[in-house]
Amino acid sequence: MPYLDHAGSTLPSKTQLEELAKLQTQLILANPHSHHSTAIKTQQIVSSARHRILRYFNTTADDYFVVFTNNTTHALKIVAENFNFGHRTQEGVVSEISAVLKGGPSNFAYFNDSHHSVVGLRHVVLGKVDAISCVNEDVVKEECIPKVENSLFVFTAMSNFLIPFQINEKLISGWSVCVDAAALVSGTRLDLTAHRPNFVAFSFYKIFGYPTGIGALLVKKDSSKSIEKTSFAGGTVQSVDEMTMHFVIRDFERAYEEGTINSYGIAQLQKGFEEIERCGGMQAIRAHTYDLRSKAVQILQSKTHPNGKKVVEIYSQPHIQVSPETQGAIVAFNLVRPDNGYYGYTEVEKMCAIFGIELRTGCFCNIGACKKYLGITSEMIKENMSKGKRCGDEIDLINGRPTGAVRISFGRMSTEQDIEVLKQMIDTCFVSSEKVFSPSLQSLKIDSFLPTVVNLFSFPIKSVGSVAKSRYELTPRGFKHDREFLVVKDDVTLNLKMHPELCRLTATIVNDEELHIQTFDQNDNLVIPMSLSLKENDAKVVCKKTIATFDCGDKVGQWLENALDMTNCRLLRVAGESKKNFVNDSPFLLINEASVYMLARHIDMDVQDILTRFRSNIVVRGLPPFIEDTAKRLSIENLEFEVVDKCTRCEMICVDPMTGEKDPSLLLALRDYRNKQKMTFGIYIRQSNFEPGQFVEAGSAVRFFTD
């Protein structure tokens, strides 16, 4: 699975999860506020975790406190809510945001390029400060930083849009600095001997993927008096009286860890740190991810349309000398059309889903960065909102301008294959080309992808339209009632290739009780009870298989003759005891949505139209195009299947199932792709562990294997 959202959340490794599972079966913890032996053991584990965290950041308990929090946002909010801004010199609340740093007492500042969790703190401190400043990161490089007192700067250590920022020691000497390290810790170890900020906020899942729901606030000990706890909760006091205002706060760390802490989550942190060590430490991870980012940028920059126009617009700061120290493992970009217009990021995300690529789109909860790199103004934000634009929605272009971007980010488990699949997706879906793209499957391994079932179809009557459902019961013959009926004329089987008149019919089975056949215009309808007493017919040979059948009777035959404008038509049904149905070669036909999309784009045909023409039972999403050709077996949840063969295609796919008209373009596109090989598309599969009462459902996870 090409996972390219490590800045959002990195992934735990298989070894890490196995170690955690073993730990959970052996570990028994208790409320650390109690005093029995299990509670004392819990206290010791928590204390050990604090020391392990400090060691990771190259500091000790002599210099920093460790306060456990729910996440980075929670840690930042603790600082903002409890910071001592001193006595204000102005009345009222701040009504305007300054674009420069202010001097004097009671100031709050943050970068333009900050996460919304940081920007939102301004409303926490609104009534406590004289000035709020939102500044460009270049301001901290200036020699003259205004002198302040009792002031807080929430400093973004690394933009989740682009790059890490450098901390100016002059800033630290004048302000209380709270570092938002959420994005930074995903690929870099913050060394607290090189920089000694007053506060550091981060989440552990950003470092090693698991556990979620637990973060930390590191507080420099000589800065601890700059925040003051004015309330208390369970486990936070030394003494309290419910009838008076008397209370005395316990030690610093527990004062801010209100209630019972996440002891099991804290115990799991050790396995995360061990995982980082197995990878060679964060320095090795940073080198690995920087190398991948460099290769990705090189590939993206090389993409051009036939007219020479660039396909990818990468957002960067040209004046910065790129290195592992100045560049995070993040690439933000948009895709550009041959006419210099933009592809919307929602369209890109949908194509990525087809290819199994997971990345981030939008503004990444960082509107300041979007404004800076996309040329959006404050007025445009308000205007866009009046047009319906909301955070997290699918409105990706307004007046032809992007409202967000595409972001890829790398982690310790990222590989070059992730980049290769992204390259294939861009080449297939967004590079203007006059010839079909032929992806190379040699470097890709299908068993590393995690696709899902997106569509299920059955065909009650062979060569008649499909029935789409989200759930189908399995039988030894395939989906229940799939190809259970067959139309014959003069004892010869009718198929769509030779008799496009069949496209006039649709069929569905209602509650396993009735077969409903309709003309396409729905002017005529035939209902056949599934319990109808049928007349046994001679066995029929269909695709070299001899199948016992029943005749559905004269009334049904007459209806078909009228609907198809033919004579001597009969509807046959597979005999109940038969282990075969009217499928051509195998109980199931599986196709890959990305392969469909690639052909659709080449001939400018609707994807749903092509899906209908290929008449599959199972459609999967989340694979690169045509990689399904390499599979030998697969599983859908706990259902196991073997690959019987590839499906060789004929001119039947040229028939428009809606009109019966023939158009050879799809077959020609497939021929061009196969390049003198058999024109196959999709794979035939057969279940190998069938048991009665099994079902397959849309949304189910699929695993492919090549052995």
From Swiss-Prot:
Pathway: Cofactor biosynthesis; molybdopterin biosynthesis
Active-site residues, as the UniProt record annotates them: 365
SUPFAM superfamilies tied to this protein: MOSC N-terminal domain-like (SSF141673), PK beta-barrel domain-like (SSF50800), PLP-dependent transferases (SSF53383)
Domain of life according to the entry: Eukaryota
Keywords attached to this entry: Molybdenum cofactor biosynthesis, Pyridoxal phosphate, Transferase
EC number(s) stated in the UniProt entry for this protein: 2.8.1.9
Catalysis performed (reactions): Mo-molybdopterin + L-cysteine + AH2 = thio-Mo-molybdopterin + L-alanine + A + H2O
Modified residues (N6-(pyridoxal phosphate)lysine): 206
Cytoplasm found in the keyword field: no
GO annotation, biological process: Mo-molybdopterin cofactor biosynthetic process; molybdopterin cofactor metabolic process
Residues covered by the MOSC domain: 558-705
Obligatory cofactor(s): pyridoxal 5'-phosphate
GO molecular function (one): pyridoxal phosphate binding
HAMAP family assigned to the protein according to its UniProt record, in alphabetical order: MOCOS (MF_03050)
PANTHER family: MITOCHONDRIAL AMIDOXIME REDUCING COMPONENT 1, MOLYBDOPTERIN COFACTOR SULFURASE MOSC
Similarity remark: Belongs to the class-V pyridoxal-phosphate-dependent aminotransferase family. MOCOS subfamily.
Function: Sulfurates the molybdenum cofactor. Sulfation of molybdenum is essential for xanthine dehydrogenase (XDH) and aldehyde oxidase (ADO) enzymes in which molybdenum cofactor is liganded by 1 oxygen and 1 sulfur atom in active form.
Protein name: Molybdenum cofactor sulfurase
Organism this protein belongs to: Caenorhabditis briggsae
